Regions:
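C-terminal amphipathic alpha-helical segment
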Residues: 239-273, 298, 302, 306, ...
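Amphipathic alpha-helical scaffolding segments comprising HEAT/armadillo-like alpha-solenoid repeats
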Residues: 296-299, 326-338, 359-362
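Short coil turns that connect the paired helices of HEAT/ARM alpha-solenoid repeats
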Residues: 306-308, 336-344
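Positions within the helices of HEAT/ARM-like alpha-solenoid repeats
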Residues: 313, 344-346
Length: 362
């Protein structure tokens, strides 16, 4: 114990942090900073959001009390949080082309490749092991959206960007197309000195473009109206008034990021695991609707898409096909699903069928 105390007192933590930064770059992280383990002001903002019921069915957001804003409650002894960024930017032109092609399926960019949770967790674990190699055993916990944590607030405090009006983190040199992850540590690492100020100014492009008006105020997202929530987290029937605005977005939505002026500086990712799988960046609605449950499970293995489940996958596709142009193939696909054993699938297939038929009569 005495040796450990002496080692701690004589540790050059700035030199250690410099080494951590270098190793993080080698592991594919595109930004890194250190935040203090205190987020009480952000906890108040979260609680107000919860009190308004704007988290929808995401009951897990209301659990754990102050644990999100008190990292030391989640990982005992936490003194500082290493926050990292990994870019997943791609060509915006293809995204717009898909959105403007009603018969095509739009899958949010982050979900086209391998599940980022698994990839980043592995890389963060390797970063923690590097630290252990440098200084010996220390207490830490790796997080990638896997425990109660205010990751955007931590990243902001670590100097990685500011929280934009669409509630995503923005870096003035890299935009907002990136994932976040953390290592909670008991090391007194030097804190990031620069806390980026907001640079959204009077811009409201993200608010204006939202198909369902889910951004109800700057920095305020009503998840109950958000297409990402509706197509991924929400279980059961999608409110009927929100189905048409969903368009052909079958898993998530990127509109608020696609229009953000800061994303002209976004970096195109160089991570092979983020490349689109199973042709998901140019698949037709009909092709995906034809997947059996076995095909869905097989083709979404290792993908974030599996989170939504097969029933909600069919539900989302039924809505999207209903929003497409009427064709014999679209009508036939929906008609087949009106006999599906699940009532949610039947309901949305029937809605889509009525919508296509109304377009034919118009």
């Amino acid at each position: 114990m005495a040796c450990e105390a002496f080692y701690t007192l004589t540790m050059d933590y700035q030199r250690l942090l410099d080494k951590i930064r270098l190793r993080s770059t080698e592991l594919g992280f595109t930004g890194i900073g250190v935040a203090e383990a205190e987020l009480q002001a952000d906890q108040a903002h979260l609680q107000d959001w919860l009190d308004q019921g704007q988290h929808g069915q995401m009951d897990y957001m209301a659990r754990h009390g102050d644990m999100r804003s008190r990292p030391d409650l989640l990982q005992a002894g936490t003194l500082s949080v290493i926050s990292v960024r990994m870019d997943y930017g791609a060509d915006d032109l293809q995204a717009w082309q898909t959105l403007n092609s009603p018969a095509s399926a739009y899958v949010a960019r982050y979900a086209l490749g391998r599940d980022y949770h698994k990839l980043m967790r592995q890389r963060l674990k390797r970063l923690a092991e590097f630290i252990e190699h440098e200084i010996g055993a220390f207490n830490y916990r790796v997080l990638v959206d896997s425990a109660p944590s205010l990751e955007r607030a931590l990243a902001r405090n670590a100097g990685l960007g500011w929280i934009g009006k669409h509630t995503c983190l923005i870096d003035k040199d890299s935009g907002s197309w990136f994932f976040l992850g953390e290592i909670y540590t008991d090391l007194p690492l030097p804190r990031s000195n620069e806390k980026p100020q907001g640079h959204c100014g009077t811009c409201t492009r993200c608010i204006d473009v939202c198909p369902t008006q889910a951004i109800v105020a700057p920095n305020r997202l009503d998840a109950r109206r958000c297409i990402s929530y509706l197509t991924i987290e929400h279980r059961g029937s999608i409110p009927e008034e929100l189905r048409a605005p969903i368009g052909n977005r079958i898993f998530g939505c990127d509109d608020c990021q696609l229009v953000c002026p800061w994303n002209k500086f976004a970096k195109i990712h160089a991570e092979p695991d983020f490349a689109a799988r199973n042709n998901l960046d140019q698949a037709s609605l009909l092709d995906l609707m034809a997947w059996t449950e076995e095909e869905f499970l097989s083709r979404t293995e290792g993908s974030a898409i599996r989170r939504t489940g097969y029933i909600n996958w069919l539900r989302n596709l039924a809505v999207a096909i209903g929003n497409a142009e009427p064709s014999a193939a679209h009508l036939a696909a929906l008609n087949e699903k009106t006999a599906h054993p699940d009532p949610v699938v039947r309901e949305h297939a029937e809605w889509g069928l009525r919508r296509l038929e109304s377009k034919l009569r118009a």
